[in-house]
């Protein structure tokens, strides 16, 4: 099967980042035997995998390598915590692969994702489209057609992962006003609503699960 031949460094960089995220998450889960936390982690990691895979940031071979790496580094008993993750990921890889002739504007999409990763605190669709010298509606259409997500989906997902890093490194629940501002949200209420809509739990509930 053909693989997307994009920027090798960019592809490897994100595959490594994803591997690191899963490693940290698994290590955390194995210390805390809480089923609900495992479900939350599965959801977030799968969401991240889908975003990166659909964006062709890493291809099928790298995704398969990721699953092999998980099995090499964790026992079957440990992987039981994330059994559904592995199954769902395999299914997703098999069912969502699209031929390259349907993949258009890869450079444009890759650039947009890179900008979101690097400037998530202040980036907006208008500024990004201006930098690319294209119409915002055209950029939105390209992202939707190729990644099956919106600009805001990508931006909110990135910000949520940054918020999770805050939670994992905080001994007490961060004040939402400060966290929201640091992430680039206009208010704590807006951040709260976005987090709850994407994760299914409130920031407070997630922090308590991660710190239990």
Please report, for each region that a protein language model flagged, where it lies by residue.
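Terminal helix-turn-helix DNA-binding modules in bacterial transcription factors
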Residues: 113-118, 145-186, 208-212
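Short, Lys/Arg-enriched anionic-surface-contact patches
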Residues: 96-108, 149-159
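Basic, amphipathic alpha-helical hairpins
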Residues: 71-74, 90-101, 111-124, 142-147, ...
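Conserved phosphate/pyrophosphate-binding and hydrolysis machinery centered on Walker-type P-loop NTPases
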Residues: 34, 79, 102-106, 125, ...
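The cytosolic transmitter module of two-component sensor histidine kinases
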Residues: 37, 82, 105-109, 176
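Hydrophobic, helix-rich cores of sensory/ligand-binding and other regulatory modules
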Residues: 1-95
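Amphipathic alpha-helical repeat elements characteristic of tetratricopeptide repeat
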Residues: 16-23, 106-110, 157-161
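Basic/polar phosphate-binding segments, predominantly the helix-turn-helix DNA-binding elements
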Residues: 92, 126-158, 180-206
């Amino acid at each position: 099967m053909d693989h997307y031949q994009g920027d090798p460094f960019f592809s490897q960089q994100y595959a490594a980042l994803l591997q690191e995220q899963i490693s940290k998450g698994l290590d955390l889960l194995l210390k805390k035997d809480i089923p609900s936390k495992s479900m939350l982690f599965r959801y977030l990691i799968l969401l991240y995998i889908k975003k990166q895979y659909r964006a062709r940031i890493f291809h099928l071979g790298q995704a398969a390598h990721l699953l092999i790496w998980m099995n090499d580094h964790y026992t079957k008993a440990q992987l039981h915590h994330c059994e559904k993750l592995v199954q769902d990921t395999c299914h997703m890889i098999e069912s969502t692969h699209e031929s390259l002739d349907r993949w258009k504007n890869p450079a444009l999409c890759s650039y947009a994702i890179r900008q979101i990763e690097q400037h998530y605190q202040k980036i907006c669709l208008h500024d990004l489209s201006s930098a690319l010298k294209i119409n915002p509606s055209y950029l939105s259409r390209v992202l939707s057609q190729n990644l099956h997500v919106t600009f805001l989906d990508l931006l909110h997902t990135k910000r949520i992962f940054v918020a999770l890093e805050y939670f994992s490194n905080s001994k007490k629940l961060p004040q939402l006003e400060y966290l929201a501002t640091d992430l680039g949200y206009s208010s704590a209420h807006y951040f709260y609503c976005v987090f709850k809509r994407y994760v299914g739990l409130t920031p407070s509930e997630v922090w308590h699960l991660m710190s239990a």
